Amino acid sequence: MAFYGTNAAVAWVNTTGTGTIRDSFNVTSVTRNGEGDISVNFTNNITDNDYVVTGWTDNWEGSNSDSGGIVTGESNSCMAEDGTRIVTIRARFDQHPPQRQDFGVVCVSIFR
């Protein structure tokens, strides 16, 4: 089922931290720039960089409930009309500091 119109996702991707795309909409490719650092490249440019990026990762350690993933922007200028660059961070609550990690599942949605 597809939803088009105001407030619909303009792009989304279900990928691995290493750049393999499982499924996507309006995403040409995912590029691994380094550990926990990926670029999401859009098929069709978005009109400007005034969009919203949301993200989710799986649990990096599998069943260990004290280890979670954080999706954040790579920099203050990581959103462009042709794509965005994100960082995935493993945040384990009994270890510091958080570390960039390639998660098994990374989901990113873009809304405009």
Report the location of each language-model feature.
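Extracellular jelly-roll beta-sandwich "head" domains, especially the C-terminal globular C1q domain
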Residues: 61-112
